[in-house]
Amino acid sequence: MLMPKRVKYRKQHRGRMKGKAKGGSLVAFGDYGLKALEAHWITAQQIEACRIAITRTLKKSGKLWIRIFPDKSYTKHPAESKLGKGKGNVEGWVAVVKPGRVMFEIGGVSEELAREALEYAATKLPIRTKIVKRHEIGGEAV
C-alpha cells in the first residue's frame, strides 16, 4: 500500500474539501487521464485497486502514472469503545482529491485500450470521473 515513509505528526485534522483542484488538472505525462468530478478521500487501497485494474487491462504495453498520493492519515476508535479517551489510532491513509484533479494517466497505447482500462479503474473509485485526453494546440503539447 502507498503511505508516507515518515511524517512529522501522525494524526491530522479532517479538514474541509472546498473548491476545485489548484494543480494537477491537466494531463501532463501520458496521453489519456482519469479526472475526478467530485471531492472525496481516496484511500490507499482504492488507489492500489485502480493500479491493478489498469495494469491488468494494459498487460505489458503502455505506461501508467499515478498522480495522487495518500499523505493524510485518518483515525478510528476500536468497535464498542466508549466516547472520549482521546483521538483514535491511525487506521489508514487517504489522498484528498478535489474536482478537476487528474488521478491516473496512461501513455503509449491506443485510445480504445486506454478508454477500456480507465473505465474499468473508474468502477473501483467512490466518485464520478471523466476520461480526458492531452490537448495539443498548434502541434505542441500543452
Swiss-Prot record:
It comes from the Bacteria. CDD domains: Ribosomal_L16_L10e (cd01433). InterPro entries: Ribosomal_uL16 (IPR047873), Ribosomal_uL16_bact-type (IPR000114), Ribosomal_uL16_CS (IPR020798), Ribosomal_uL16_dom (IPR016180), Ribosomal_uL16_sf (IPR036920). The keyword DNA-binding does not apply. GO terms for cellular component: cytosolic large ribosomal subunit. Keywords: Ribonucleoprotein, Ribosomal protein, RNA-binding, rRNA-binding, tRNA-binding. GO terms for molecular function: rRNA binding; structural constituent of ribosome; tRNA binding. One of its GO terms (biological process) is translation. PANTHER family: 50S/60S RIBOSOMAL PROTEIN L16, LARGE RIBOSOMAL SUBUNIT PROTEIN UL16M. Belongs to the universal ribosomal protein uL16 family. Binds 23S rRNA and is also seen to make contacts with the A and possibly P site tRNAs. HAMAP family: Ribosomal_uL16. Part of the 50S ribosomal subunit. This is Large ribosomal subunit protein uL16. It comes from Thermosipho melanesiensis (strain DSM 12029 / CIP 104789 / BI429).
